[in-house]
Amino acid sequence: MRTPKEKNSRSRSWEDDPRPRYWWHRLPGMNFVPPVYSELTDEEWAILREWYDETDRTGVGAIGECVVPMISFLHGFMMGNRARRIVQLGTCSGYSAILIGFMLRRMNAPRGLYSLDMSAEMCAISHRWIARAGLDDFVAIVELNSTDPNGLQLAREYLGGAPELIIVDSSHEYRATLTELDLWYPALIAGGLIVLHDVSRFAADFDVTKAGGVRRAFDEWRRAHPEVETFCLNGESQTMDLPRPLYKDACGLGLIHKPGIPAGSE
């Protein structure tokens, strides 16, 4: 077993790594291990570190994780409230699916994450790592377009009820994101939360269709649904340069809260 000093040095090896994906660890004052990493067992940390090593070698196609600010938000929200029925739209190569799987296992919440991605390659990578981490009882990786209506019933059947938390980090395209919100919001349990990555002006450029990205979809959807509680962090961010606002991710974070109290059966 590692000593406390070794445990507290885990992600600090990335503080001097110049590669873009490690930007958070190079920010001023971030010379510590965030709780989402420090709470992992030695075996879990080894899995995540090996995942990083492999995806570093694989290259750009496998790199697209949400990194520390967003996963830390999800970590606190999930663990503090025992969110146990989660849908993820966009799996990429499995970073958040692995970490959410570890959280679900810690909470003893099996069949807790239903993660969709339309890329067969990304699903294969993610599924291999989920199996390697021993998370097959907690996470399902499904090759399916997140705009496919069939996903609604499939997710509900796997989770055993309506999703409590939906994470949107998929195509980054305006039209697809708007379709996702229209499709999945009605499926969300009353009192549930949708979390969207990439709602900023900076991230709008990720839309390969050049139609305004997640930011435009989120803005239009929230204007069309004034009865719904919504919030946008860093929506005006236009650069990764310093100085950064309090929420450090220039890609921004959007929140959609479905008003109401869930029925007792949920």
Locations of the language-model features?
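A short alpha-helical cap/connector motif
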Residues: 1-167, 171-266
